[in-house]
Amino acid sequence: MGVSFTFYPEDATYIHFDVIRSFDRPLLSSGLLEKIGNQNVKTELDWQLYLLQRRYLDYQVNIGNRIIELLTSGKPENQAKAAEISLPKTHFQNLVDDLFSETGKKILRQSNEIQFEQDGDILTPYQLSSGEKQMLVILLTVLVQDNQPCTLFMDEPEISPHA
């Protein structure tokens, strides 16, 4: 059997890809933990979330720069285009809020990093359940692709993403 790919364009020379690992087991490299300086990062999922937080910050800067460029262009039609640029981020936030609604968690939209509010408390992604972390890793990985073509390789060791 095997795997086959159909490329578009046909003369493409590379595939942009990302890997999602959803194992929630403890990190073994204590040297790595010391380097990042975040005591909340304890598992492989936490590590993925940590890396995705950095990519999310870059994503926000990039879309912010594109919005500024459009708004300062002097072209009236670019105002509508500028508003459209932030739609994927808003869709992501709405989707996460909907998926986590049973637990009362909502994304703090005014925060630069991913944080949640639940019953007046502020939560980091590291405080989420394993299934919530897995879902957040998947959705964040898709968001930070910034509408660019990408192949995602993903394992699924647990049933929790189905719930």
Give the residues covered by each predicted segment.
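Phosphate-coordinating catalytic segments in nucleotide- and nucleic-acid-processing enzymes
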Residues: 1-123
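Switch/communication elements of ASCE P-loop NTPase nucleotide-binding domains
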Residues: 91-163
